[in-house]
């Protein structure tokens, strides 16, 4: 089976951060599946557009995007939507049988649902954060318009 795996913050063992998606994808490959990972490259890069690498049999499609925890909320939201738009286009260009998308951010649901409908294939959505409840509780989403939009995205995704 050809599996499209969407995770904006995919990490390999030599990168800092969690490797849950890497481990899942690696094991799916080991079971005989083809896995196509769509993710972002968050470090400085010479690449200006998508580039592909192979990691333990996983076809990893990287989109260079500038992202930092030091960004403002507005800057982060722009990055999330930029990645969603570009990954939606990339997703429909791949010939796959099923889509597996994992959050966070919740905007990963946008390219997953779009590609699922466009390609007429099933989609599985893994929720790994209670969003937007968590950022609201933490005080990160204070603006009423932002909260409203976050709740609309939540209804769409869930």
Map each language-model feature to its residues.
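A conditional alpha-helix N-cap/helix-loop micro-motif detector
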Residues: 17, 80-84, 146-147
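Acceptor-binding helix/loop patch of EC 2.4 sugar-transfer enzymes
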Residues: 8, 65-75, 94, 118-151
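N-terminal subdomain of nucleotide-sugar transferases
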Residues: 1-64
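Membrane-proximal helix-turn-helix segments that form the acceptor-binding/catalytic region
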Residues: 88, 107-110, 114-118, 144-158
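Internal alpha/beta domain cores that form substrate/cofactor-binding pockets in large enzymes
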Residues: 73-81, 89-91, 110-121
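Short N-terminal targeting/anchoring amphipathic segment
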Residues: 87-108, 121-124, 128
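Generic structural signal for helix capping and beta-alpha/helix-loop junctions
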Residues: 13, 45-47, 70, 108, ...
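Short, glycine/charged-enriched secondary-structure capping and boundary segments
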Residues: 18-21, 50-53, 113-116, 138-142
């Amino acid at each position: 089976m050809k599996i499209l795996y969407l995770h904006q913050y995919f990490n390999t063992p030599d990168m800092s951060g969690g490797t849950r998606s890497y481990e899942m994808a690696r094991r799916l490959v080991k079971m005989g599946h083809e896995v196509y990972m769509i993710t972002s490259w968050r470090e400085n890069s010479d690449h200006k557009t998508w580039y592909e690498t192979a990691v333990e049999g996983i076809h990893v499609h990287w989109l260079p995007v500038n992202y930092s925890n030091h960004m403002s909320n507005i800057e982060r939201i722009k990055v999330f939507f930029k990645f969603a738009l570009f990954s939606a286009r990339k997703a429909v260009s791949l010939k796959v049988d099923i889509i597996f998308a994992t959050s966070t951010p919740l905007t990963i649901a946008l390219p997953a649902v779009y590609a699922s409908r466009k390609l007429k294939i099933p989609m599985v959505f893994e929720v790994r954060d209670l969003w937007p409840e968590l950022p609201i509780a933490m005080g990160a989403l204070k603006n009423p318009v932002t909260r409203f939009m976050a709740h609309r995205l939540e209804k769409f995704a869930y």
